[in-house]
């Protein structure tokens, strides 16, 4: 990328501070010119409450969900936010303590209860969080905020009011679902979640929610499982955050970061644990890649294998002359990256933040190429015949296909993460450009654009400025893939600056078009979408 900016003032700590919700939208001060065609709402979510009374949350993914909205109309911008009224939030506010265990924070029984009632409360089963702080996605005409459990929360995208909690277990066989479903052009939703398969072993189900039909029945009522992927360990599913989808195929990457279900069901219920306590790494399995035929709903028993890495975000997946191209934001090795995302680490002074990041898995953007047709006579050969990639796939004598990637980007402690593309037109298809959030030792301090064919990089960066995931919005009359703008929420705690602003960049070269400043701090946000008016 470019010269690394240092952060000795520690302004990034503002990303992890509690804020209050707003009673009404704020008018933003716009400099530059917002394109008049940009009409709609940028919706984002993330943690906004980092403690309840005297009880702190400990992990980045623990804070209570705050829903944000920037409205664009005729070149003007307003900003609004409200806490999502999940069970976790409402009960915490009512009891003035953390009531439901979060990703890295344990909830303990009410200290006012006697020892017998506290003991028996542990045997009521695991109480799963509905803290919907990770992403927002549409189902039919509705919008849902989500985490990665079986609960999703229906919200009103206009008022930011919470409508209701939905338990996916009531409709489909999954223990949870990722926060990164795929949405097809007709509104069909695909997602993945682990489940209990045959003989009580763990598997992964691909679920499909159809588009809204003329009968106006809630599409979630018509959810179905379309294919099932086997698990490499019958009692320890891998952590899954996203997956790949093309018009004809589904790609699932099974990493060595595992959920120990015995620990989840026993330790948690009996003496208290949190989600992070239940993760472990399989140091010998490497990574398994699975493929299924989407239309025929058939699992391919091709044994794709490669060396270990963590994976959270797929960039894009597409078909190319009998091969699948799978572009990923990887973290090298089998150790869980989330071990380094405790708030105490992220709030350290800059030199300590860098020291901690030096110990963590290192990021790399990779392209894997998966051959769909396998012939045993090719044992020992590289099966990749595409001229435009250095990625390889070698058939071994044990019938596994060993994959080596083409590296699209690699920088020491510099990650290209939270990737976005022109998804509406190029999701699941050959593409050229990806946009990402640049992490400098886990601190988000730049926005990036990558040409995945030439590996050229463009970048936006300013001192004491901490952007969010870039959201690409195509202009209505777009002729080229990158005709449009990139939107990002920037926290700017430096002297002489407003606390935060919405940044509008030209998607061609990441030059600034406009910014809309607000007189309030905005904590870290993870994911979101642009909803056109």
UniProtKB/Swiss-Prot annotation:
- Similarity comment: family membership: Belongs to the carotenoid oxygenase family.
Give the cofactor note text: Binds 1 Fe(2+) ion per subunit.
Question: At what positions is N-acetylserine found?
Answer: 2
Per the record's keyword annotation, is Acetylation included, yes or no?
Answer: yes
Q: Name one GO cellular component term.
A: cytoplasm
* Main location (coarse class): cytoplasm
Q: Could you state a single Gene Ontology molecular function term?
A: phosphatidylcholine binding
* Tissue-specificity statement: Retinal pigment epithelium specific.
Q: Where in the cell is it found?
A: Cytoplasm; Cell membrane; Microsome membrane
Q: Which organism is it from?
A: Mus musculus
Null mutant phenotype:
Mice exhibit changes in retinal physiology and biochemistry. Outer segment disks of rod photoreceptors are disorganized, rod function is abolished although cone function remains. Mice lack rhodopsin, but not opsin apoprotein. Furthermore, all-trans-retinyl esters over-accumulate in the retinal pigment epithelium, whereas 11-cis-retinyl esters are absent.
The membrane topology of this protein is: Lipid-anchor
Write down what this protein is called: Retinoid isomerohydrolase
Indicate which residues the UniProt annotation says bind Fe cation.
180, 241, 313, 527
Positions carrying Phosphothreonine = 101, 105
Q: Where is the lipid attached (S-palmitoyl cysteine)?
A: 112, 231, 329-330
User: Which reactions fall under this protein's catalytic activity?
Assistant: an all-trans-retinyl ester + H2O = 11-cis-retinol + a fatty acid + H(+); lutein = (3R,3'S)-zeaxanthin; all-trans-retinyl hexadecanoate + H2O = 11-cis-retinol + hexadecanoate + H(+)
Query: Which keywords belong to this entry?
Result: Acetylation, Cell membrane, Cytoplasm, Disease variant, Endoplasmic reticulum, Hydrolase, Iron, Isomerase, Lipid metabolism, Lipoprotein, Membrane, Metal-binding, Microsome, Palmitate, Phosphoprotein, Sensory transduction, Vision
Explain the post-translational modification: Palmitoylation by LRAT regulates ligand binding specificity; the palmitoylated form (membrane form) specifically binds all-trans-retinyl-palmitate, while the soluble unpalmitoylated form binds all-trans-retinol (vitamin A).
Give the InterPro entries listed for this entry: Carotenoid_Oase (IPR004294)
Q: What does this protein do?
A: Critical isomerohydrolase in the retinoid cycle involved in regeneration of 11-cis-retinal, the chromophore of rod and cone opsins. Catalyzes the cleavage and isomerization of all-trans-retinyl fatty acid esters to 11-cis-retinol which is further oxidized by 11-cis retinol dehydrogenase to 11-cis-retinal for use as visual chromophore. Essential for the production of 11-cis retinal for both rod and cone photoreceptors. Also capable of catalyzing the isomerization of lutein to meso-zeaxanthin an eye-specific carotenoid.
What are its GO biological-process terms? circadian rhythm; detection of light stimulus involved in visual perception; neural retina development; retina homeostasis; retinal metabolic process; retinoid metabolic process; zeaxanthin biosynthetic process
Pfam family of the protein (one)? RPE65
Q: What is its EC number?
A: 3.1.1.64, 5.3.3.22
């Amino acid at each position: 990328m470019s010269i690394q900016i240092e952060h000795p003032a520690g302004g990034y700590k503002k990303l992890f501070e509690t804020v209050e919700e707003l009673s009404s939208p704020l008018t933003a001060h716009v400099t530059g010119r917002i394109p008049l065609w940009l009409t709609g709402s940028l919706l984002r979510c993330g943690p906004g409450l980092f403690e309840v009374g005297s009880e702190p949350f400990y992990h980045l993914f623990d804070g209570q969900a705050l829903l944000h909205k920037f409205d664009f109309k005729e070149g003007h911008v307003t900003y609004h936010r409200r806490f999502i009224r999940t069970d976790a939030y409402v009960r915490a506010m009512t009891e003035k303590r953390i009531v439901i265990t979060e990703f890295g924070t344990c909830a303990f029984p009410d200290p006012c209860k006697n020892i017998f009632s506290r003991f028996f409360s542990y045997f009521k089963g695991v109480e799963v969080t509905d803290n919907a702080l990770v992403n927002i996605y549409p189902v039919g005409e509705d919008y849902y905020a989500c985490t990665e459990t079986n609960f999703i929360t229906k919200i009103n995208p206009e008022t930011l009011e919470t409508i209701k909690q939905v338990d996916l277990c009531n409709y489909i066989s999954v223990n949870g679902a990722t926060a990164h479903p795929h949405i097809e052009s007709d509104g069909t939703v695909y997602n993945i979640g682990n489940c209990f398969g045959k003989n009580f072993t763990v598997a992964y189900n691909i679920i499909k929610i159809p588009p809204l039909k003329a009968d106006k029945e809630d599409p979630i009522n018509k959810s179905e499982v379309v294919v099932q992927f086997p698990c490499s360990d019958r009692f320890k599913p891998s952590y899954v955050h996203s997956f790949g989808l093309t018009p004809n195929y589904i790609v699932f990457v099974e990493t060595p970061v595992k959920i120990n279900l015995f620990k989840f069901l026993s330790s948690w219920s009996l003496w208290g644990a949190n989600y992070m306590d239940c993760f472990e790494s399989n140091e010998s399995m490497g990574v398994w890649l699975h493929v299924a035929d989407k239309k025929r709903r058939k699992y391919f028993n091709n044994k794709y294998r490669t060396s270990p890495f963590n994976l959270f975000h797929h960039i894009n997946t597409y078909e190319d002359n009998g091969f699948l191209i799978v572009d990923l934001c990887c973290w090298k090795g089998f150790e869980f990256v989330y071990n380094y995302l405790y708030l105490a680490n992220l709030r350290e002074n800059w030199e300590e933040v860098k020291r901690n990041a030096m110990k963590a898995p290192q990021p790399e953007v990779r392209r894997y190429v998966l051959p769909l047709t396998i012939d045993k006579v090719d044992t020992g050969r590289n099966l990749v015949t595409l001229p435009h990639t250095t990625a390889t796939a070698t058939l071994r004598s044990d019938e596994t296909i060993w994959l080596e990637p083409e590296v699209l980007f690699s920088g020491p402690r510099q990650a290209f993460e939270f990737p976005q593309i022109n998804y509406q037109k190029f999701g699941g298809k050959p593409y050229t450009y990806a946009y990402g959030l640049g992490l400098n030792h886990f601190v988000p301090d730049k926005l990036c654009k990558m040409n995945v064919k030439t590996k050229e990089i463009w970048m936006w960066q300013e001192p004491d400025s901490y952007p969010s995931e870039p959201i690409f919005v195509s202009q209505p009359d777009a002729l080229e893939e990158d005709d449009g703008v990139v939107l990002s929420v920037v926290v700017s705690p430096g002297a002489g600056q407003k606390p935060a602003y919405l940044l509008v960049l030209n998607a061609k070269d990441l030059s600034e078009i406009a910014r809309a400043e607000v007189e309030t701090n905005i904590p870290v946000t993870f994911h979101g979408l642009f909803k056109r008016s």
